[in-house]
């Protein structure tokens, strides 16, 4: 299937689980059954979706910190799902370069959200990367590996 398609499924699941908060495991399993996923795709989707919700407080704090003047309740649910996915990838997945996480998030925004969303998401994620790189000891620049 590929990482891009898996990322799209993960974003849709994060969005769906934000809207319908009950029976998460059942919703995840039902959604995954709809697709012909190999083991790598399935593992990636499960890791990202479960990781977003496990780390949601931290991720949402990051979004609020860098979306000056925007409360989470003002951010569209689709944009929020995209941001949560990308920030999880950037902060908790060492196998995904920052530029890939940002570019994929912007593409998802272009396909699933409003006109301004790509710029909004790019701006927030750019600030996240800048802070991560400034606070790193030089070993965390995954884009140069």
UniProtKB/Swiss-Prot annotation:
Protein name: Transcription antitermination protein NusB
Keywords: RNA-binding, Transcription, Transcription antitermination, Transcription regulation
The keyword Transcription is annotated on this UniProt entry: yes
Annotated CDD domains: Terminator_NusB (cd00619)
Family: Belongs to the NusB family.
Single GO BP term: DNA-templated transcription termination
Coiled coil region boundaries: none
GO cellular component: cytosol
